[in-house]
């Protein structure tokens, strides 16, 4: 479930009967054929600065622009209570605690009672869970109990990252938990076919490839700056590569350097 500037991929729900399984699939179209009530559960959202927060912000803004109603569920952060978004939406703020290795962020604690109360009062058409922490797990359990369709995001290879932080011995247990978590959903969104193939080989089911969108008005050849290129000492036709992100082992920056070397050939 992700938005580009031109296209909007909206989660559609097909329930053939009360007693049959729910099927979630993606379809591209412009303005919504009908308005959906979507509850988004996440550990992070702007003003947090990270890839998941930025991606979710774009997704929520795009869904709102197409007429959908969003209810955001997230832990209360230290510096702010209200999320930042281009348009208003409802929020449920829950208790949280600092995340190990990312103390600037807070991990949502289980919130079964709050979620059951909210979703019983205002039942969503679909619950979308972006993170797999205690808050996400409790959201998954409540949604299943209330028979609400659930989609999830697989954005972070926590099992692969574990070796970079001295807990590689937990890799198998982490992967097992992630597989159990996502396989309990009706659909799991992944950004690339490569990741989908890898997860499928590890026993993950109902994977949907949803590539990252690009704002073609913001990132456009019309904004090309010769002054900026001159400051880089880059010629007119020379390829310039830019990496934006943390300098961390799990970012696989060796691949960036290898790609750069191949591009120069």
Language-model regions, residue ranges each:
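A short helix/loop element that forms part of the nucleotide-sugar donor recognition site in Leloir-type
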Residues: 220-234
């Amino acid at each position: 479930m992700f938005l580009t500037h031109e296209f909007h991929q909206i989660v559609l729900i097909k329930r053939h009967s009360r007693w049959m399984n729910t099927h979630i699939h993606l379809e591209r179209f412009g303005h919504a054929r009908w308005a959906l009530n979507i509850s988004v559960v996440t550990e992070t959202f702007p003003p947090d600065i990270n890839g998941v927060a930025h991606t979710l912000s774009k997704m929520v803004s795009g869904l709102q622009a197409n007429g959908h109603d969003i209810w955001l569920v997230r832990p209360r952060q230290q510096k702010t209570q209200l999320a930042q978004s281009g348009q208003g939406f409802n929020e449920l703020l829950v208790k949280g605690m600092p995340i190990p290795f990312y103390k600037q962020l807070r991990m949502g604690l289980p919130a079964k009672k709050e979620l059951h109360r909210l979703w019983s009062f205002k039942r969503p058409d679909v619950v979308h869970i972006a993170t797999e922490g205690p808050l996400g797990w409790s959201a998954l359990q409540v949604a299943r109990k209330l028979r609400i369709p659930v989609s999830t995001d697989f954005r972070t290879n926590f099992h692969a990252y574990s070796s970079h932080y001295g807990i590689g011995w937990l890799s198998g247990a982490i992967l097992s938990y992630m597989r159990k978590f996502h396989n309990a959903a009706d659909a799991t969104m992944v950004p690339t076919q490569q990741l989908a193939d890898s997860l499928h080989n590890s026993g993950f089911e109902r994977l949907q490839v949803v590539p990252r969108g690009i704002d073609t008005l913001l990132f456009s050849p019309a904004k090309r700056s010769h002054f900026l290129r001159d400051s880089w000492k880059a010629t007119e036709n020379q390829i310039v590569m830019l990496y934006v992100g943390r300098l961390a082992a799990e970012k696989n920056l060796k691949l960036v350097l290898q790609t750069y070397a191949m591009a120069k050939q």
